Each structure stands twice: as C-alpha cells, then as structure tokens.
Amino acid sequence: MSEASQPAYEIALAHFIVSDDVERSRRFYTEVLGGTTVRSGEPTYITLANSAIIINVGGGPTDDKPAVTLETPRDPDLASSFLNIRVSDIHAVYAEWSARGAEFLTPPKQHATEIRCYLRDPDGYLIEVGQTTLPGGWRQFLNP
C-alpha cells in the first residue's frame, strides 16, 4: 500500500469472541496462549502479540445490530471463520502451548506454503497456528 493510500485515521483489528464463561476464556488466552489481560470483566480485553482479542457473553439483539444475536458455536466442527495466528517457529509454539494445556487437533503439518496446525479454545472456536514457508515469512503480507 502506498503512502498516498493510507487513511487519515488509525485502524486496529481485534477478534471478538462470544463466550459462555468469559473468565475461563480469559485464562485460556492468557495462560495457554500467552496473552496479556488489559481489562477484565464483560467485556474482557486481551492483547496477544500485535493484536487484540475481545471476549464477552452472547446476547442481543441490540440497537446497533437489531437482527443479530451473538452465541458460541453450536457445532465446533462447522466453522465459517477462525482465528489465524502466524508465528515464526511453529514447532516451538506447538511445544510451549501444548505444555500449557493446549489440545491441538494434530501436530504441525507441512502444506504448500506453510506449516500449520489447529486447536480449539474452551468455547470450541477453531484457531489456526501457521508458519509461512515463503521467503520473507508472514511479515510480507503486512508490508507488500
């Protein structure tokens, strides 16, 4: 993206997670994945690397989303979206997070342009952990 096309305001991307137990999810994202709690309660804010995760209970509709109700996944084996965490050493992350209690679906697997594996959070959300094997690694996608 060129300098000229940068917006005149800041943008940050955060992942919002609906949880049946906000405190349990907070512990998972901090104690297992290594995030930092910025704010506890409903909602809870966690920073993880250069990103943010917001955890709150479900509910709705509300005045700003009048036809939307937020809930945890009904079937964790059906996903239309998932958190994707890019790392520089997937084997180290896999070992560290496994030791902290993460339950991965499989060990890291080699694919065409990445090594990846998946785990679930306490509410059943799918999380991909991936290491790009292309020259330049994952940072190339941030500054093309």
Where are these regions (language model features)?
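Short, solvent-exposed loop/helix junctions and linker helices
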Residues: S19, N84-V87
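Short Gly/charged-rich anion-binding patches and loops
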Residues: R24-S25, A92
